[in-house]
Amino acid sequence: MRHGKAHRKLGRTSAHRTAMFANMSASLIKHEQIVTTLPKAKELRPFVEKLVTLAKRGDLHARRQAISHVRDVEQVGKLFAVLGPRYKDRNGGYIRVLKAGYRHGDNAPMAVIEFVDRDPAEKGKDSGPVAEAAFAEA
């Protein structure tokens, strides 16, 4: 019987899942919209919703709790400075998951996960030092 099994394993160890959700949530906070597989998007949504609720609280303990989950201090700064105040009057439902067809190659169902009142200017910004290093080598 499948009682009490609340989350998907996604074919990963628990440490890999935790790291993956930390990285994906940092990317989502940075770009405010990312494309991933549908099961990952559905599992990421409650993770990020809880982070936004922490940001709405705004105290030091909430910030430290968010850093322990995301592990990217710069993105936690944006979470508390931009996203927390943006959603201060909204009671949950900060994230939307839209189905985006199927991936070529393995036919995996894809999804776009984004913030509800996102800033369109954030889309397509650099993805950090990795992208800058790739351009420097070329």
UniProtKB/Swiss-Prot annotation:
GO terms for biological process: translation. One of its GO terms (cellular component) is cytosolic large ribosomal subunit. The keyword Magnesium does not apply. Gene3D superfamilies: Ribosomal protein L17 (3.90.1030.10). The keyword Metal-binding does not apply. It holds the Pfam family Ribosomal_L17. InterPro entries: Ribosomal_bL17 (IPR000456), Ribosomal_bL17_CS (IPR047859), Ribosomal_bL17_sf (IPR036373). Keywords: Ribonucleoprotein, Ribosomal protein. It comes from the Bacteria. One of its GO terms (molecular function) is structural constituent of ribosome. Part of the 50S ribosomal subunit. Contacts protein L32. Belongs to the bacterial ribosomal protein bL17 family. This is Large ribosomal subunit protein bL17. The lineage of its organism: Bacteria, Pseudomonadati, Pseudomonadota, Alphaproteobacteria, Caulobacterales. The gene is rplQ.
